[in-house]
Curated annotation (Swiss-Prot):
It comes from the Bacteria. InterPro entries: Ribosomal_bL36, Ribosomal_bL36_sp. This is Large ribosomal subunit protein bL36. Pfam families: Ribosomal_L36. SUPFAM superfamilies: Ribosomal protein L36. GO terms for biological process: translation. It comes from Helicobacter pylori (strain Shi470).
Amino acid sequence: MKVRPSVKKMCDKCKIIKRRGVIRVICATPKHKQRQG
């Protein structure tokens, strides 16, 4: 899980979702998981 100021899709499988006001990226590749913090 990477915490960064701007989240971007890193591949085609990445999905940007909003959970409890937090923007997250979920992906099949664990390395691509991100959240905005």
